[in-house]
Amino acid sequence: MLRRLGVRHFRRTPLLFVGGDGSIFERYTEIDNSNERRINALKGCGMFEDEWIATEKVHGANFGIYSIEGEKMIRYAKRSGIMPPNEHFFGYHILIPELQRYITSIREMLCEKQKKKLHVVLINGELFGGKYDHPSVPKTRKTVMVAGKPRTISAVQTDSFPQYSPDLHFYAFDIKYKETEDGDYTTLVYDEAIELFQRVPGLLYARAVIRGPMSKVAAFDVERFVTTIPPLVGMGNYPLTGNWAEGLVVKHSRLGMAGFDPKGPTVLKFKCTAFQEISTDRAQGPRVDEMRNVRRDSINRAGVQLPDLESIVQDPIQLEASKLLLNHVCENRLKNVLSKIGTEPFEKEEMTPDQLATLLAKDVLKDFLKDTEPSIVNIPVLIRKDLTRYVIFESRRLVCSQWKDILKRQSPDFSE
């Protein structure tokens, strides 16, 4: 087994700690799990058809980055409070150069946007990584010097899934700020935060997996949602079987907007059953999918939903090529595939919608790969797998929408 040892040094620096009033630290509110009762409450208060934004819920540790006006030092917080600089928290110190760059850039852009100085700027996010059990990925053991002592960088989560990277990373999902020391924190609306995040080179942030009315978001199957993170942190060519995501964080699109007066919950967790923290059985029996009925009704209403393509493919050139690939799934190509098959498989009732969709998807991929650039053909394995899934999905949707007409046209008695 390969092992690498890396050491980073950080000098202990004095910290001006927060006073007893806790005016700097902003505890990140716990998010309620979704269930049928809470979804029905959204319907009852008229928020069900509002726009909602779902991002991947990363399995890690809550982590905040604080920039305070007049202080040169950046502060870092876990869920329970701001940490002294010598506290060992999974080895986050190794990320400090990047974290400082992120918060400095966000502060500059936000102050420019607000056209005023801000007392505190805060990026909320998740610290994650430290485990990736793939035979082609070397096991790593890194240490970082904290207060003159070597401390081992440890995995934030040790479950068999989801696994993201052998290294430690930060995933940003919120921006908050205080104009004055005595003021309250203001949360940026999701789209405003994303506008700033995407302008910071190297910053990993919560992109929308799916957005729209809750009827559309709830049709997304979190039970079969493969994490989108590994390709973003260099693991795209090292797929893991069953690397399911923890779930989604679903926010109201107007959360943080001035004047927004919600009548119901504005943030919910849609968690994979494997990550439910309680059982509905008093005897702690098998976990159940509390969203099963809601998801079934939503699928009947909005259809099965896949992640937005932009959350899977983030390179602009690859994204454009991916959209072109999906444009190959069209009615004219379906007619061409049918002409190659003939009528006999339909006469003998041997052809099913899934079989026809598979033939269509294969034809799409064959033609696309024949004409596309080598750089697109050689995209990471995980992204290739995702794109194949999208092609099959779109092929099935097209075939199913025309199946009755296809059966009619493939009948030997059909005439124009």
Curated annotation (Swiss-Prot):
Any single GO CC term annotated in Swiss-Prot or TrEMBL for this entry: kinetoplast
Gene3D superfamilies noted in UniProt: 3.30.1490.70, DNA ligase/mRNA capping enzyme (3.30.470.30), RNA ligase (1.10.10.1810)
Binding site for ATP: 29-31, 56-62, 79, 126, 173, 269-271
A UniProt-annotated Pfam family: RNA_ligase
GO biological process annotation, one example: mRNA modification
Superkingdom of origin: Eukaryota
Keyword line: ATP-binding, Ligase, Mitochondrion, Nucleotide-binding, RNA-binding, Transit peptide
Catalytic activity line of the entry: ATP + (ribonucleotide)n-3'-hydroxyl + 5'-phospho-(ribonucleotide)m = (ribonucleotide)n+m + AMP + diphosphate
Subcellular location: Mitochondrion
One GO MF term attached to the UniProt entry: RNA ligase (ATP) activity
Enzyme Commission no: 6.5.1.3
Presequence range in chain numbering: 1-17
Protein family according to the UniProt entry: Belongs to the RNA ligase 2 family.
Function as written in the Swiss-Prot or TrEMBL entry: RNA editing in kinetoplastid mitochondria inserts and deletes uridylates at multiple sites in pre-mRNAs as directed by guide RNAs.
Entry-linked NCBIfam families: RNA_lig_RNL2 (TIGR02307)
Entry protein name: RNA-editing ligase 2, mitochondrial
Organism: Trypanosoma brucei brucei (strain 927/4 GUTat10.1)
